[in-house]
């Protein structure tokens, strides 16, 4: 079993940005003490939903502040920055940390990012796939060049070279069938969403495995991650109530940060996300409290045993043994750390990998 910690850098109304940054640093350091293998940093711009515009810089700080902890991005919005600059950052972190950096990528969901950085959101999928191909080739070859409809530049040597054999490990934040199939073609591990239930996670893995096997990948050695909103307390009601205010603001901030869910939005390539939002509305989840209540049904929020039951159900359904949690809904920094430590002592030791013979 492996365990990760998502550091959201969301700014609740009662916190200053300086307080959010202090929380990020402290939780990153404490994560290593609490037995987490990896912390994951999210890229967001122009919204209190996440204050981390450059996860590479934050990753460098946390890698320098820890000894064994892996630090990953979940995820870099791949199409909005030049692929050569990105590989330079990735390789530098890979070298300086001696292989402790994890390169999580996505194609992006927030309209303003694309407008400000001068990228056409309608082409986000094609750009992300193109950028990944260039970056991955650069990781292994040490050089990059491009001559296609999206980008053109002459062959250049990328410094420094990667430290890890084959480059820093790459992960994909995957929600739609299209992204799942694309990740499977390359055998890239997915970070699965915390907003889908066990049956949906199982179906996503089945689709991935079918495609990955067609491309010759060993599906038993791909390090997928299950992601969760997490709050652990011996009092189940307290665990849920302490999260409610934070999650209410956080969910609303998420919806308000993009226009992709508006019926009037005509951006191409986001039919899955729009359809998922329509399903939420039909289920009554547009109401914030109802959405939170549903989140509690599929995320480890409650007593240690309740958390074990929810996570173990997903492990048994998917075979995934890399569990990534986000604890920041737990209130103050001290309350967040208390929840992390209780998770370490009363949840981590009792989660079991699915037996290989029963995996698929």
UniProtKB/Swiss-Prot annotation:
Disulfide bonds: none
A single GO molecular function term of this UniProt record: alkanal monooxygenase (FMN-linked) activity
EC number: 1.14.14.3
Pfam families: Bac_luciferase
Keyword line: Flavoprotein, FMN, Luminescence, Monooxygenase, Oxidoreductase, Photoprotein
Keyword RNA-binding applies: no
Family per similarity comment: Belongs to the bacterial luciferase oxidoreductase family.
CC terms in the record's Gene Ontology section: cytosol
Catalytic activity as recorded in UniProt: a long-chain fatty aldehyde + FMNH2 + O2 = a long-chain fatty acid + hnu + FMN + H2O + 2 H(+)
Family matches, as PANTHER family: BLR5498 PROTEIN (PTHR30137:SF8), LUCIFERASE-LIKE MONOOXYGENASE (PTHR30137)
Miscellaneous comment as given in the Swiss-Prot or TrEMBL entry: The synthesis of this protein is regulated by a complex control mechanism that has been termed autoinduction.
Gene coding for it: luxA
Gene3D superfamilies: Luciferase-like domain
Subunit structure as annotated in this protein's UniProt entry: Heterodimer of an alpha and a beta chain.
GO biological process: bioluminescence
Protein name, entry field: Alkanal monooxygenase alpha chain
Physiological role: Light-emitting reaction in luminous bacteria.
């Amino acid at each position: 079993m492996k365990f990760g910690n998502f550091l959201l850098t969301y700014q609740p109304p009662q916190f200053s940005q300086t307080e959010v940054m202090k929380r990020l640093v402290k939780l990153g350091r404490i994560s290593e003490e609490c037995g987490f293998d990896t912390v994951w940093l999210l890229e967001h711009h122009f919204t209190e939903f996440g204050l981390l515009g450059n996860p590479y810089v934050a990753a460098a700080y946390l890698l320098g502040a820890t000894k064994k902890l892996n630090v990953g991005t979940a995820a870099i919005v791949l199409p909005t920055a030049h692929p050569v600059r990105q590989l330079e950052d990735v390789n530098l972190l890979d070298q300086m940390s001696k292989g402790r950096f994890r390169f999580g990528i996505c194609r992006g969901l927030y309209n303003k990012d694309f407008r400000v950085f001068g990228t056409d959101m309608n082409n986000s999928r094609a750009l992300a796939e193109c950028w990944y191909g260039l970056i991955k080739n650069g990781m292994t070859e040490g050089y990059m060049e491009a001559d296609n409809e999206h980008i053109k530049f002459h062959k250049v040597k990328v410094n420094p070279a990667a430290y890890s054999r084959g480059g820093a490990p790459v992960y994909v934040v995957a929600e739609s069938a299209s992204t799942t199939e694309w990740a499977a073609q390359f055998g890239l591990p997915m970070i699965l969403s915390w907003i889908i239930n066990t049956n949906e996670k199982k179906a996503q893995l089945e689709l991935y495995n079918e495609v990955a096997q067609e491309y010759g990948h060993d599906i038993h050695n791909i390090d997928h991650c299950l992601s969760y909103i997490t709050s652990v307390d011996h009092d189940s009601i307290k665990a849920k109530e302490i999260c409610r205010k934070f999650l209410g603001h956080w969910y609303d901030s998420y919806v308000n940060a993009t226009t992709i869910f508006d019926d009037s939005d005509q951006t191409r390539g986001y039919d899955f996300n729009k359809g998922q939002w329509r399903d939420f509305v039909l289920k009554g989840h547009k109401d914030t409290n109802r959405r939170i209540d549903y989140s509690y049904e599929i995320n480890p929020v409650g007593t240690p045993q309740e958390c074990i039951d929810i996570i173990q159900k997903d492990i048994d359904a998917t075979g995934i043994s890399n569990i990534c949690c986000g604890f920041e809904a737990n209130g103050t920094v001290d309350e967040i750390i208390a929840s992390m430590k209780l998770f370490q002592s009363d949840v981590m030791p009792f989660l079991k990998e699915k037996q290989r013979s029963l995996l698929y």
